[in-house]
Amino acid sequence: MATSISTQRGQVFIGELPQDFLRITPTQQQQQIQLDAQAAQQLQYSGVMGTMGRLSITVVQAKLAKNYGMTRMDPYCRIRLGYAVYETPTAHNGAKNPRWNKVIQCTIPPGVDSFYLEIFDERAFSMDDRIAWTHITIPETLKEGKHVDEWFSLSGRQGDDKEGMINLVMSYTSVPAMMPQQPVVLMPTVYQQGVGYVPIAGPIYNPGMPMAAPPPAVNPQHQTREEDIKFIKDMFPTMDPEVIRSVLEAQGGNRDAAVNSLLQMVEDS
């Protein structure tokens, strides 16, 4: 039991303090708010198996309506998908017919079904000039294992869908995504002590069994086939077969994507 003594600064407690010293008892409404917040967090982070997609976009070339450069135009593409931004190399002096042949691997978060594409003219002494743009919905046929090779209209200063067209080759792969398993809140039983703070209801955890992501199934179409290597070797007779094999494996057996990657390697060399 605490006792009180007098000092020059007034009375002070010494010894054991009472149980309710500097404690604020939460009201029923405050406890309910805390439980609601914990329940909302549990719903947000429910440990379910989600699915994310990996989209392969090959930015092949564009046919633009006008050359906006003073002497030359050096276009490059920028793609915004979700919160991620991807860019192609600059097609130096590409003018109205730039070619990139750039393969971009994008991760599609759940709920995202489109991306935004812009074409800029790279400037040396001023801000890069945006010359064309378009909003592209990801085709549903990609999820059926098909490839899409299409020309998409571009908008710009000439008007909507009047700035030219851009050629894109797209393919899609499903990727399992594991979200963290959160404990389940059963009931508040413990109070966290603190000076001047409302005690926080402590949950009882039911961790459950840890979830393990199943190994991804091997798609026979993604296995490296000798006929694919021979086909690409005929297109690149001077290329080392082992280089072709490694690029093909890196592209998951996608022959078109491997060809685009090798084209980019040849251009960069």
Curated annotation (Swiss-Prot):
GO CC annotation: early endosome
Lineage, highest ranks first: Eukaryota, Metazoa, Chordata, Craniata, Vertebrata
Domain characteristics, as noted in the entry: Both ATG8-interaction motifs (AIM1 and AIM2) are required for the association with ATG8 family proteins.
UniProtKB keywords: Autophagy, Cytoplasm, Endosome, Immunity, Inflammatory response, Innate immunity, Repeat
CDD domains hit by this protein: C2_Tollip, CUE_TOLIP
Start and end residues of each CUE domain: 224-267
Role: Component of the signaling pathway of IL-1 and Toll-like receptors. Inhibits cell activation by microbial products. Connects the ubiquitin pathway to autophagy by functioning as a ubiquitin-ATG8 family adapter and thus mediating autophagic clearance of ubiquitin conjugates. The TOLLIP-dependent selective autophagy pathway plays an important role in clearance of cytotoxic polyQ proteins aggregates. In a complex with TOM1, recruits ubiquitin-conjugated proteins onto early endosomes. Binds to phosphatidylinositol 3-phosphate (PtdIns(3)P).
The keyword Repeat is annotated on this UniProt entry: yes
PANTHER family: TOLL-INTERACTING PROTEIN
UniProt motif (AIM1) ranges: 133-136
Single GO MF descriptor: ubiquitin binding
Residue span(s) of domain C2: 35-152
InterPro entries attached to this UniProt entry: C2_dom, C2_domain_sf, CUE, TOLIP_CUE, Tollip_C2, UBA-like_sf
GN (gene name): tollip
Entries under SUPFAM superfamilies matching the protein: C2 domain (Calcium/lipid-binding domain, CaLB), UBA-like
GO biological process assignments: autophagy; inflammatory response; innate immune response; phosphorylation
Protein name per UniProt: Toll-interacting protein
Main location: cytoplasm
Annotated organism of origin: Xenopus tropicalis (Western clawed frog)
Complexes and interactors: Interacts with ATG8 family proteins (via AIM motifs), and ubiquitin (via CUE domain). Found in a complex with TOM1; interacts (via N-terminus) with TOM1 (via GAT domain); the interactions leads to TOM1-recruitment to endosomes and inhibition of TOLLIP binding to PtdIns(3)P.
Location relative to the cell: Cytoplasm; Endosome; Early endosome
Recorded family membership: Belongs to the tollip family.
